[in-house]
């Protein structure tokens, strides 16, 4: 992971935790071009995600309907989501809370052999 400053939010992107401002979605990503993806949001209460498993179950129903395989299972998505919340806890105001979001796109819509490093689904938490 790149150097992290104490005031930067952390995200999980395609298998790695990184500063949120370093998450880069290619401009040819199908979610950007066509809205071809799914998302869900879970609110926290006192820093704890509310009904996260239920949100993730609903999210995976959407992914199955869209026939997008994010490459990780629901249990991993829950664990990574909880870890994102934990890694950002020090930034939460005393009376504040978060929304933790899961976003999955079908991936890059490559034209020809352009050499994209990642052509599978893009997963962001």
Give the location of each predicted region.
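Conserved alpha/beta cores of soluble small-molecule-handling proteins
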Residues: 1-125
